[in-house]
A protein has these predicted regions:
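C-terminal domain-boundary segment and adjacent tail
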Residues: 1-7, 39-40, 49, 102, ...
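A Trp-anchored, charged/polar loop motif used as the substrate-binding/catalytic surface
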Residues: 21, 171-185
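Non-membrane alpha-helical structural segments and their capping/turn regions in soluble enzymes
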Residues: 87-92, 177, 209-212, 216
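DG-centered beta-turn motif at the end of beta-strands
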Residues: 15-20
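Metal-dependent polysaccharide deacetylase catalytic core of the NodB/CE4 family, i.e.
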Residues: 13, 33-133, 138-151, 157-166, ...
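Gly/Pro-rich active-site loop or hairpin
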Residues: 56, 166-171, 206-209, 213
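Short, glycine/acidic-enriched loop or turn micro-motifs at the edges of active sites
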Residues: 21-22, 78
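Histidine-anchored nucleotide/phosphate-binding helix
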Residues: 25-32
Length: 247
């Protein structure tokens, strides 16, 4: 049966949060639930996820995010540059997170984001083999990469591969309120805005840090301007995912 997808509305915003930072559960999720917003939380066991449970989620908290209706996505076991990994290493990293999710009763992740935004055709081929629906990258090459945040292109499903969805705005010290407004305004005429956050706050990685009060200002703006705020997997309501294209 052919799935009938909805027209892409203006002000369609995708929220993503990388690395499994503790604030995902303690601050971000309750605020998003208040407004009925969805989001994707991309989980890795790299960085200090396994060692520092004051700053990173426990797997029980990850399960809690899933039970609250949010999407849990795959961000690899080791958080390595996927372009430096062999095919076998990348597959092992992906399978590890899949199995950790399954062990906790979390649905098998359907979407992926590239650690450090790095991507290459070989990695895309692996994601395709693993049947991911969508994958999120960074701002480059359309916009210059800045490790403290910045602007990127809106996601245009007629132009961008579903396993190479760009980041329209990446939060960090280099990303201002004006940049946020600009990113939201790109969500029109069939384009979708994809926002990338890390910790709110991110004490381990200040170059991707977002102040809680600043984040609340962003979320209030999305609510006040009647934005539709979704997880990456929810794009399937509007956009043909990779597996459907392949089939």
């Amino acid at each position: 049966m052919i799935k009938v997808r909805l027209p892409i509305p203006d002000r369609l915003i995708v929220l993503t949060f990388d690395d499994g930072v503790k604030s995902d559960a303690t601050y971000v999720a309750p605020l998003l639930k208040k407004y009925g917003f969805n989001a994707t939380f991309y989980i890795t066991e790299g960085l200090n996820f396994l060692q520092d449970k004051d700053r990173y989620l426990t797997w029980e908290e990850v399960r809690g995010l899933d039970e609250a209706g949010f999407e849990i996505g795959n961000h690899t076991r080791h958080h390595k540059d996927v372009c430096t990994q062999s095919r076998e290493e990348l597959i092992a990293d992906l399978v590890h997170i899949d199995r950790r999710c399954q062990a906790k009763g979390i649905p098998l992740p359907e979407t992926f984001c590239y650690p450090g935004y790095s991507n290459c055709p070989e990695a895309v081929d692996v994601l395709a083999e693993r049947q991911f629906l969508f994958a999120r990258r960074g701002m480059a090459p359309e916009y210059p990469y800045h490790n403290e945040g910045g602007r990127g292109p809106a996601y245009n499903p007629t132009q961008h591969h579903p396993l190479l969805i760009p980041t329209t705005g990446a939060s960090g010290p280099n990303w201002t309120y004006d940049d946020f407004i600009w990113a939201v305004e790109q969500a029109r005429d069939g384009n979708i805005t994809v926002l990338t956050f890390h910790g709110v706050p991110d004490l381990d990685h200040p170059w991707v840090h977002t102040e809680p009060d600043t984040f609340k200002t962003y979320i209030d703006y999305l609510h006040e301007h009647d934005c539709t705020v979704i997880a990456v997997r929810d794009l399937d309501q509007y956009v043909t995912p990779f597996t459907a294209i392949k089939n």
